[in-house]
UniProtKB/Swiss-Prot annotation:
<keyword id="KW-0597">Phosphoprotein</keyword>
<comment type="similarity">
    <text>Belongs to the universal ribosomal protein uS10 family.</text>
</comment>
<dbReference type="GO" id="GO:0042254">
    <property type="term" value="P:ribosome biogenesis"/>
</dbReference>
<keyword id="KW-0689">Ribosomal protein</keyword>
<keyword id="KW-0963">Cytoplasm</keyword>
<dbReference type="GO" id="GO:0002181">
    <property type="term" value="P:cytoplasmic translation"/>
</dbReference>
<dbReference type="InterPro" id="IPR005729">
    <property type="entry name" value="Ribosomal_uS10_euk/arc"/>
</dbReference>
<comment type="function">
    <text>Component of the ribosome, a large ribonucleoprotein complex responsible for the synthesis of proteins in the cell. The small ribosomal subunit (SSU) binds messenger RNAs (mRNAs) and translates the encoded message by selecting cognate aminoacyl-transfer RNA (tRNA) molecules. The large subunit (LSU) contains the ribosomal catalytic site termed the peptidyl transferase center (PTC), which catalyzes the formation of peptide bonds, thereby polymerizing the amino acids delivered by tRNAs into a polypeptide chain.</text>
</comment>
<dbReference type="InterPro" id="IPR027486">
    <property type="entry name" value="Ribosomal_uS10_dom"/>
</dbReference>
<dbReference type="GO" id="GO:0022627">
    <property type="term" value="C:cytosolic small ribosomal subunit"/>
</dbReference>
<keyword id="KW-0687">Ribonucleoprotein</keyword>
<dbReference type="GO" id="GO:0003735">
    <property type="term" value="F:structural constituent of ribosome"/>
</dbReference>
<dbReference type="GO" id="GO:0005829">
    <property type="term" value="C:cytosol"/>
</dbReference>
<feature type="modified residue" description="Phosphoserine">
    <location>
        <position position="37"/>
    </location>
</feature>
<dbReference type="Pfam" id="PF00338">
    <property type="entry name" value="Ribosomal_S10"/>
</dbReference>
<comment type="subunit">
    <text>Component of the small ribosomal subunit (SSU). Mature yeast ribosomes consist of a small (40S) and a large (60S) subunit. The 40S small subunit contains 1 molecule of ribosomal RNA (18S rRNA) and at least 33 different proteins. The large 60S subunit contains 3 rRNA molecules (25S, 5.8S and 5S rRNA) and at least 46 different proteins.</text>
</comment>
<dbReference type="InterPro" id="IPR036838">
    <property type="entry name" value="Ribosomal_uS10_dom_sf"/>
</dbReference>
Amino acid sequence: MSQVAKDQKEQQIPSTVHRIRITLTSRNVRNLEKVCSDLVNRAKDKQLRVKGPVRLPTKILKITTRKTPNGEGSKTWETYEMRIHKRLIDLHSPSEIVKQITSIHIEPGVEVEVTIAQ
């Protein structure tokens, strides 16, 4: 009798659907797009509501320095830049399923941040 009561309690507890935001950042666009497409494809295979990937503006960090180490010679300048690309993916699903989806191979240089909201 107690086993039946436990089974009924388990059936009554609904799996709450959370809004999960996955933020991906990288300096390499190809690796970033590959990880995004893998995440979206796995989420669609599980029949989840997916919004994204949303492409956020690219941050361009620039440093300008003199080419010569001393002050002599012509004044020539060198410019270095680093581009940081960012993508957002929103999922509406229980947190257990997200653990299965995010267990993919993540390319080197891609940072993943997962935030869960109600």
